[in-house]
Each structure stands twice: as structure tokens, then as C-alpha cells.
Amino acid sequence: MFDFDATLPLMALQFVVLAFLLNAIFYKPMNKVLDERADYIRTNEEDARERLAKAKAITQEYEQQITDARRQSQAVIADAQAEARRLAAEKIAEAQRESQRQKETAAQEIEAQRQSALSSLEQEVAALSNQILHKLLGPELIK
């Protein structure tokens, strides 16, 4: 069935030569390309990790700055509100003092006018009383 003549060793030799040729022409360049690609992927992955770490650090730093800025702005707002309340209280107190002063001035003027009116009424009452006495009693009896 099988002949063991020179074809079998020749085929074996062809197989070995073909294996060496395929290895030299196809497998080594392909392995080189695959290794270069793996190195390229590994390098890019490391760069991406570094960039991601830097981005996270920068993001964290910016978030901290935003938090600090918010705190500062809230403090500024609180200070401004306190200052506004203080100024409003001062203005209200000043207005109340001015109102009280005007009220006292008006009360003094009213009292002065009242006293003046009472004084003039007393004089008029005295004059009218004298006139009534003159009319009732006559000018001779009054002296």
C-alpha cells in the first residue's frame, strides 16, 4: 500500500523547507507586526492612564477651587447682607430720631401756640369782662 521510496523523505524535506520559509517570510514579520502593535497598544494604554490620572487630578483641583469660590461668594453675600441690614437699621434709627425730633418740635410749637392762644383769650376775656361790667354796672360804679 505505501511505498517507501525517495518520495517520503523528499516530502518530509519539502515540509521542513516550507516550514522554514513560512517562518522566515510570513510568521516572523507577522509576529514582529503583532509585537509592535501590542507595544503600541500598551504605550497608548499607559499614556491614556496617565492622562486620565492627570484629568482626575485637575478635575479634583477645579472642584476644590469651585467649592472654595462658592464658600467665598457665600461669605461675601452674607457680609453684604449683614452690611445692608446694618445700614438699613441705621437709616431706620436715624429716621425714627428725626421723626421723634420733628414730633417734639411740633409738640413744642403746638404748646407755644396753645399758650399764646390762652394768653390772648385771657386778655380778651378780661377785656370782655370789663365791657360786660361797664354795660351792666355802668361806668360810675366800676372805679
UniProtKB/Swiss-Prot annotation:
Keyword Calcium in record: no
Q: Which GO terms describe its molecular function?
A: proton-transporting ATP synthase activity, rotational mechanism
| Entry-linked SUPFAM superfamilies | F1F0 ATP synthase subunit B, membrane domain
What's a single GO CC term here? Answer: plasma membrane
* Location(s) in or outside the cell: Cellular thylakoid membrane
| Keyword Transport appears in the UniProt entry | yes
Could you identify this protein by its name? ATP synthase subunit b'
Please give the organism. Synechocystis sp. (strain ATCC 27184 / PCC 6803 / Kazusa)
- The gene that this protein is the product of is atpF2
